[in-house]
Amino acid sequence: MLVKVCGLQTVEAAKTAVDDGADYLGIICVPGRKRTIDSSVAKGISTAVHQQENVKGTKLVGVFRNQSVDDVLQLYHEYNLDVIQLHGDEDIKEYRSLIPSSIPIIKRFQFPQDCELLLDLYEHVDNVLTLFDSGEGGTGEKLNWSAISSWSASHPEIKFIIAGGLNPDNVSVAINMLPNAIGVDVSGGVETDGIKDLEKVKLFIQQASQ
């Protein structure tokens, strides 16, 4: 099970997540969001993620929302990102055609309203990973796991990362309910008073990796 810790705002939290075995670390590159970080912090986190001690090969994900391809690629290179996450209403066919195919993309789809779009796109875009999340993301809004499980049983070819309302107490339940999920994504569920809680980060990764 892949584990992504998103919305990181400090180098300390990033180092903790790397040391605890996270597969992906997400930084918010959308202007004006509560977890958006400035370039110096982003570069510090990037350095921490790409250090030699990162034996697991944790990847750094930049989260974007309805930004131009030029802006996305500029920050991709500036922050030495490994993965681009598109969390808005982007035309994934267009973005995939303009972003080098070697760069992995995570695309947010809302459930259930984006399911038909997802099915239409599935065979037409390469190196794109599906993320089921709420509209805004990072809100703690829990998705309907039962409904996703039922839909997924009819479309087992669609593997996905699940986000929305996950925390150390419920992540194992979500994983058990969603056999076609290949990853879990957490942000607010490992925070205390809006700040990443390092003990919660560690516990979440442990629970998701069992």
UniProtKB/Swiss-Prot annotation:
Q: Give start-end of the signal peptide.
A: none
Has the keyword Transmembrane helix been applied to this entry? no
An example Gene Ontology biological process: L-tryptophan biosynthetic process
**Catalysed conversion reaction:** N-(5-phospho-beta-D-ribosyl)anthranilate = 1-(2-carboxyphenylamino)-1-deoxy-D-ribulose 5-phosphate
- One Pfam family name is PRAI
Keywords (alphabetical) are:
Amino-acid biosynthesis, Aromatic amino acid biosynthesis, Isomerase, Tryptophan biosynthesis
TM ranges are none
InterPro entries in alphabetical order: Aldolase_TIM, PRAI_dom, RibuloseP-bd_barrel, TrpF_fam
Q: Which EC number(s) does UniProt give?
A: 5.3.1.24
Instruction: Please give the pathway this protein is involved in.
Output: Amino-acid biosynthesis; L-tryptophan biosynthesis; L-tryptophan from chorismate: step 3/5
Q: What class of enzyme is it?
A: isomerase
Q: Does the keyword Amino-acid biosynthesis apply?
A: yes
Query: CDD domains in the record, alphabetically?
Result: PRAI
A molecular-function term among this protein's GO annotations: phosphoribosylanthranilate isomerase activity
Q: Which family does it belong to?
A: Belongs to the TrpF family.
Protein name per the record: N-(5'-phosphoribosyl)anthranilate isomerase
Q: Which organism is it from?
A: Kluyveromyces lactis (strain ATCC 8585 / CBS 2359 / DSM 70799 / NBRC 1267 / NRRL Y-1140 / WM37)
